[in-house]
Amino acid sequence: MTEESNQANNHGNDTYSPIRTKVRMQRANGFRILEMYEEAEEELSKICPEDRLERDVLTMNLAVRQDAEDWSSMLKTARILRRQYPDASEWWIAEAYALRRSESMESAREVLLDAEKRHVDDPCIKYNLSCYSCRKGDIKTALRYLLAAVELDAKYKKLALEDEDLVEMREVLLKLGFSTESEPDES
C-alpha cells in the first residue's frame, strides 16, 4: 500500500491511533535523548488531540521541554499536570522548577508552600523549600526545612553538601555531621 492510499484509507489522518500514540511517544523520547528537541516536539504534535492530555503524553512533553530548557512551555505543561493530578507531588515540584527559571524564585517558593500543605511528608518539597530559603538568605528556615527533608529521606543529607543552592550553609551542615560519604545501612 502506498503512502497516498494509506492516507486515503485513513481519510488523511494516518497518525491518530493508540498504537501510533505509543510509537510517537517512543520516537519523541528517542529524539529527546539525542537532544533533538524540535524533532521530539514534532512527534508529540502529531499525537491525536484526544491523547495529548493523557498523563504519559504530558509527562513526555514536560521532559522534552525541561531538557530543552524551554521553561515557559514546561511551566504550562507542569500546571496542566498539577491541576489534573494534585495528589502527585512531582507535578507541584515540576511547576516550581519551571517557575524558578521562567519567572522568579519567589513564585516557585509560593507553589511549594501550597504543595507542602497537601504533601506534608514529601521530602523533595521540603528540600526545595530549604534551597529557596537559603538562596533568600534565611539560613534558619533553610536548615529547618533541610532537617525535615533528611528526617524523611536520608539521601538529602549527602545532596545538601553538593547543592549550589545550599552553599551558604555548608559550614553549618559540616558542623552538624553532614557528609558526602554514604552512611552504612542500619540493619
Q: Which residues fall in each region the model found?
A:
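Alpha-helical segment of the N-proximal tetratricopeptide repeat
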Residues: 17-67, 94
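Structural signature of tandem alpha-helical TPR/SEL1-like repeats
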Residues: 5-6, 34-42, 68-80, 102-114, ...
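TPR/TPR-like (Sel1-like) alpha-helical repeat modules
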Residues: 134-158, 181-184
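Alpha-helical adaptor scaffolds
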Residues: 56-124
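N-terminal acidic, proline/glycine-rich, low-complexity intrinsically disordered segments
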Residues: 1-11
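Canonical positions in the second alpha-helix
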Residues: 13, 46-47, 80-81, 114-115, ...
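TPR/TPR-like alpha-solenoid helical repeat scaffolds
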Residues: 62-67, 97-100, 131-134, 155-178
